[in-house]
Amino acid sequence: MNEQVLIKALVEHAYLEGDFVLRSGRRSRYYLDKYRFETVPELLGALGERLAIAVAEHEPEVARLAAPELGAVALAAAASLASQLPFLIVRKEAKGYGTSNRLEGVSESGELVCLIEDVVTSGGAALQAVETVREAGLVCRTAICVVDREEGGSDELARHGVRLWPLFRASDLLGQVKSVVNPHG
């Protein structure tokens, strides 16, 4: 799927207009519903391939991927299959049973990890995941997301030593909204 076709598909499947409160607490007139694009096999596969390519380009020495639950796990799994890199699941909090881990999967201290994210707004969720990964003794200096909403998340991550590489920026998608929502002008 080429870039323009993928952008159009993301807008068709995931772009919603209304009054939304984002995870960051900010209000927005539009919402990119990640579950609407992560649950479509063709889109998930195409995104997994693009994420794998981006990982190879921006963090070629990476040992494994990591993804915060729940939203980015499907993306990390798709990228893992495309890249043949193992991945970790970063829990928001330790579960009260079993291993009680916040980081699920197998890793070795000192390994280089690339964070996979869905939509980044303020960078808060990504930063929490990076902190969990680092507390486990792993190195994380790169995050790759499907969409950067261009609302400060990249700068916030950079302040903590993490470079954000988006597959798309919100402006890429919003430029397609008019033609997709109202194709006849």
Residue ranges and their predicted role:
Residues 1-116, 120-185:
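PRPP-associated nucleotide enzymes
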